[in-house]
């Protein structure tokens, strides 16, 4: 058994601005797990809100975990032990996805088939961040021209208020007239209840598909108020980190958005899917600042998920990994054993 770590800076084509700030690049940690002639790849995207802010912190956490002894345990047992040890989810995800990739390769199956999912078929959204109208006008064609993108997710919740949100949204509508895309909105918790009630009706009148995380994480009382008279489906993102979070808000939302970096990997994502379904909720899977390695791992589950938002690797210049192309609007890893992605050798550190 051998673990190799590679630290890589991911540079974005376009900065991504949301209600909480702007990201220009990220320094991710890639893990290569080798055993019995097979290799598994995993990726961690550190974040201040996720418990490990740097690639160095991620590597230290993983090395400490590995040093406790991991031979002879199942993937699920190792995940549960990592949670007990309080290993940051955005760190442990690299091991979890590497273990699943390795297991699928050993079984000679595509990961999605090992997990019991059909081939991905639902188109992914591509995201545009908070920007002034003149930037939106320039950026929309750069995101959509010559692509097979079918849905655009618009980040709102501007620090400048809902008037700025409306101005930006109207420019998006104008700039997308020549492209056959559906529009979705993610406020990243940037509104209070009154703003959310107003904006949801305003957006519903403009044929938006759904609204994601209208209120701050933890505002279950506000969600209850919104849900009673919602004109749009409500999905929560920041409010849903683990499967055990779901019962607290299940009666007041229409669906949940899971992310591997939030929950710690495929192992917990499967539990989130099952728990959401048990509560009659729809599912979405999203991403953070990730390359094709983490995206391909997430895409292995998309045959059983309602909405897909796996696009961060399309905003990299360049993507240091290979394996999650956009085909007819769908993020579609190759049908080969494992999740299908790997770090390119020129990015080995």
UniProtKB/Swiss-Prot annotation:
GO terms for molecular function: magnesium ion binding; racemase and epimerase activity; racemase and epimerase activity, acting on amino acids and derivatives. GO terms for biological process: amino acid catabolic process; peptide metabolic process. Its cofactor is Mg(2+). The keyword Transferase does not apply. SMART domains: MR_MLE (SM00922). Keywords: Isomerase, Magnesium, Metal-binding. It is an enzyme of class 5 (isomerase). Disulfide bonds: none annotated. Its EC number is 5.1.1.-. Mg(2+) binds at residues 186, 212, 237. Substrate binds at residues 127, 153-155, 259, 309-311. Binds 1 Mg(2+) ion per subunit. Belongs to the mandelate racemase/muconate lactonizing enzyme family. Catalyzes the epimerization a variety of hydrophobic dipeptides. Epimerase activity is highest with L-Ala-L-Tyr, and lower with L-Ala-L-Met, L-Ala-L-Phe, L-Tyr-L-Ala, L-Tyr-L-Met and L-Tyr-L-Trp (in vitro). PANTHER family: D-GALACTONATE DEHYDRATASE-RELATED, ENOLASE SUPERFAMILY MEMBER DDB_G0284701. Part of a large, functionally divergent protein family. Protein modeling and substrate docking was used to predict the substrate specificity, prior to biochemical analysis. This is Hydrophobic dipeptide epimerase. It comes from Flavobacteria bacterium (strain MS024-2A).
């Amino acid at each position: 058994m051998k673990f190799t770590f590679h630290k890589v800076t991911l540079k974005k084509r376009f900065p991504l601005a949301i209600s909480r700030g702007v990201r220009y690049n990220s320094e991710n940690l890639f893990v290569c797990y080798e055993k019995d002639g097979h290799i598994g790849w995993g990726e961690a995207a550190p974040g201040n809100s996720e418990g490990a802010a740097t690639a160095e912190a991620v590597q230290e956490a993983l090395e400490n975990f590995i040093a406790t002894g991991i031979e002879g345990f199942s993937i699920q047992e190792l995940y549960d032990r990592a949670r007990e040890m309080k290993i940051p989810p955005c760190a442990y995800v690299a091991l979890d996805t590497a273990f699943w990739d390795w297991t699928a390769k050993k079984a000679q199956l595509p990961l999605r088939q090992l997990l019991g999912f059909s081939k991905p078929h639902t188109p992914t959204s591509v995201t545009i961040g908070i920007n002034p109208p003149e930037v939106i006008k320039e950026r929309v064609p750069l995101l959509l021209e010559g692509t097979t993108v079918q849905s655009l997710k618009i980040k709102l919740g501007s620090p400048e208020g809902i008037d700025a949100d409306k101005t930006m949204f109207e420019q998006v509508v104008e700039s997308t007239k020549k492209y056959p895309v559906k529009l979705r909105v993610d406020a990243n918790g940037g509104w209070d209840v009154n703003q959310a009630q107003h904006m949801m009706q305003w957006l519903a009148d403009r044929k938006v598909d759904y609204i994601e995380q209208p209120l701050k994480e933890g505002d279950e009382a506000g969600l209850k108020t919104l849900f009673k008279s919602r004109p749009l489906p409500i999905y929560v993102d920041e409010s849903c980190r683990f499967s055990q979070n779901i019962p607290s808000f299940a009666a007041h939302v229409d669906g949940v958005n899971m992310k591997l970096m939030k929950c710690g990997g495929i192992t917990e994502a499967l539990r989130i899917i099952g728990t959401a379904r048990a509560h009659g909720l729809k599912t979405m899977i999203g991403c953070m600042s990730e390359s094709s390695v983490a995206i391909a791992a997430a895409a292995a589950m998309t045959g059983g998920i309602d909405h897909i938002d796996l696009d961060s690797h399309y905003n990299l210049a360049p993507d240091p990994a290979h394996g999650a192309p956009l085909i007819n609007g769908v993020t579609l890893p190759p049908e080969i054993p494992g999740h299908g992605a790997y770090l390119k050798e020129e990015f080995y550190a």
